Each structure stands twice: as C-alpha cells, then as structure tokens.
C-alpha cells in the first residue's frame, strides 16, 4: 500500500498547489486521477468495523476479491453505470438524551469507499478555501484545538457577551440546489458532480421502505461532513465576511467554529464581533 499512498499523496499535493495558485478557478478535470491505486488507498482509509449497508456486505467479504471489486467499481464509475444504493437508516441516542434520537444513514461498504475516493479529490481544494475558524470535520483539527482557540479568544475580549445559535436539523434540510451551485464555483467535473448528485438522491431505507427526500445529506455518509462544510463555508462564513464585517465599526475576525452538530457561537464586544464555537466538552457543540 505504500506505493499507492505515495502516488495519491503526490496527486493531492498537485491539486492543492493549483487550488492555492488559482483560488477562483473551477476544476473541470479531476475524475481521471481516480485509478485502481486511488481506490485501494480509499479502501485503506475506510473504516472496516462499521455496520453493513442495505446489501449486507461486510469488509471481510468485500476484501476476499478486493482487486476485482475495485476494478469493477472503477469501471462503473468511468462508464457512468454506477448506481448509488439507498442508505440504511438507524436511530441512535442524541447527545445524553434518553428520549431524543439522531437518524444515521449507513451506506454500503462500496459506497463508503467511493465516497472516500471523491473526498480525497475534493479535500485538497477546499482545505485551501476553508477559513481558519472552521475546526469540525477537518483533517488535523480537533475539538481540543477548537476549545483552546475559543478560550484564547474569550481571554482577549474586553467584556461583551456570547451569542449561541443552533442550526437545527441541518443534515436533514441541506438544500440540494444551493449545494450544487456552491460546488460548481470550484468543481465542474461532470463525473464527480453526477456522483454527488446520485448520493444526494439515493434514498433512505427504513423499516423495509425506501423514501427519497428532496433535501438533506445522510449523517453517516463519508462525504456528508465535507459537503456540509462546503455549504456553510459559503452560507455562514462567507456571509460573515461579506455582509457583517463591513458593517462593523472595527474589524473583527471569525475566530473559531467547531462542527460536531451545527451550533456556533459569536463573541461580541462593544464594537467588535467575532463568531466562534468550542467543543462538545463545553456543551457548545453544534447539535444536528
């Protein structure tokens, strides 16, 4: 796997360099980078101990013919024949509640691998775009780092107050049309956009019935955290930079944002506003 990892890393570095060099450019050709080695690396990065999806296939079963399975998957992607299966919905307790639950969508193992492969293509672009305040669902960033940054911001503030905002049921209500528009600002590769569209429309199986929501992205999907970060990068972070900052008497910084659900906080002083979020340990995590 070492050679595969090196090859993938080199390609990702090239994507990242181009994204940094051309921050307004939309990438039109990325899917060709996805070869068998890329899928092998995606498989290596995919959790193998999770529950099976609607097809019941486990990692052990898939790995018995891994090379053949990945080549078949790649062929279906390249030809456009890949069909995203429904996710299997289960409900887990929400936070520490004994009454509320959170719906989780469990993709098939093969879907997880392909979603991971697409995330590996998109992350080098969006990691150049995302703001320093965003900590949730990002590689190399943690709840503890968000908490420390939040504490530092509070200590540097001279008075003021903290405003907490809860974006309820964000995953369930994510607007597909707006998400597609945001994606196309940086990605216009037809293969990738069609794959993402298939995942958004794949449907949800629960109690033997399949439904097809016209909004949302299943919690539990490998690509869902990245899609949510892209959406909020434009809707929340972009709004703050574009519309809020210019109306403030003093300049301010969007300091810290932690996504575990979708709750964020704004630290406000007399003339300066910055929004932030800490970690679940401080009970200021975003609750989906």
Question: What are these language model-derived features?
Answer:
Residues 1-288:
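Non-catalytic terminal/accessory segments
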């Amino acid at each position: 796997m070492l050679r595969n990892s090196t090859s993938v890393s080199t390609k990702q570095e090239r994507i990242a360099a181009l994204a940094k060099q051309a921050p307004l450019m939309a990438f039109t050709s990325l899917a060709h980078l996805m070869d068998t080695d890329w899928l092998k690396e995606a498989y290596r990065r995919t959790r193998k101990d999770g529950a099976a999806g609607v097809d019941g296939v486990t990692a052990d079963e898939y790995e018995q013919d891994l090379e053949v399975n990945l080549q078949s998957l790649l062929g279906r992607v390249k030809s456009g024949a890949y069909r995203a299966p429904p996710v299997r919905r289960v409900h887990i307790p929400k936070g520490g509640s004994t009454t509320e639950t959170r719906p989780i969508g469990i993709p098939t193992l093969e879907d997880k691998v392909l979603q991971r492969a697409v995330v590996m293509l998109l992350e080098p672009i969006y990691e150049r775009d995302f703001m320093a305040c965003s900590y949730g669902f990002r590689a190399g960033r943690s709840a503890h780092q968000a908490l420390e940054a939040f504490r530092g911001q509070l200590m540097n503030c001279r008075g003021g107050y903290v405003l907490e905002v809860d974006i309820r049921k964000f995953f369930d209500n994510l607007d597909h049309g707006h998400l597609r528009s945001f994606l196309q600002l940086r990605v216009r590769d037809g293969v990738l956009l069609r794959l993402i569209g298939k995942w958004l429309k794949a449907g949800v199986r629960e109690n033997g019935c399949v439904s097809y929501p016209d909004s949302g992205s299943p919690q539990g999907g490998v690509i869902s955290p990245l899609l949510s970060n892209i959406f909020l990068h434009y809707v929340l972070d972009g709004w703050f930079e574009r519309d809020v900052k210019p109306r403030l008497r003093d300049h301010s910084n969007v300091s810290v944002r932690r996504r575990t659900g979708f709750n964020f906080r704004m630290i406000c002083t007399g003339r300066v506003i910055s929004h932030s979020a800490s970690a679940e340990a401080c009970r200021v995590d975003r609750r989906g």
